[in-house]
């Protein structure tokens, strides 16, 4: 498998899934992704965090859905039926991130990731771990952990 080489020490590369929320491009390390599924109607959870859209149960597994547009203060999707859920697993917890489009996967060198400074990303509460320049656009790498 091609992805396994990225786990070996010394490759100095990672694969990043590019997606959009609003008009901006974002990325997440592919190693953190469990699967990508089309938008599902979710069940709201009373008294949950405002960024939690609700829950859904594909294949009898309950997954919390986080509305990434709310998290990053972006506009809602213009066509929710075309949206996607990026399902991740962090600390044995399955979480789906509601995004507007999924663009594709890019293999990048760690050296190509530009670290954000403190004016862009507060050290303790920022979700951006870096920025990658791809062709004519900037892709902001998000860390959901």
What are the residue ranges of the model-derived segments?
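An acidic, low-aromatic, low-complexity terminal/linker signal
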Residues: 1-145
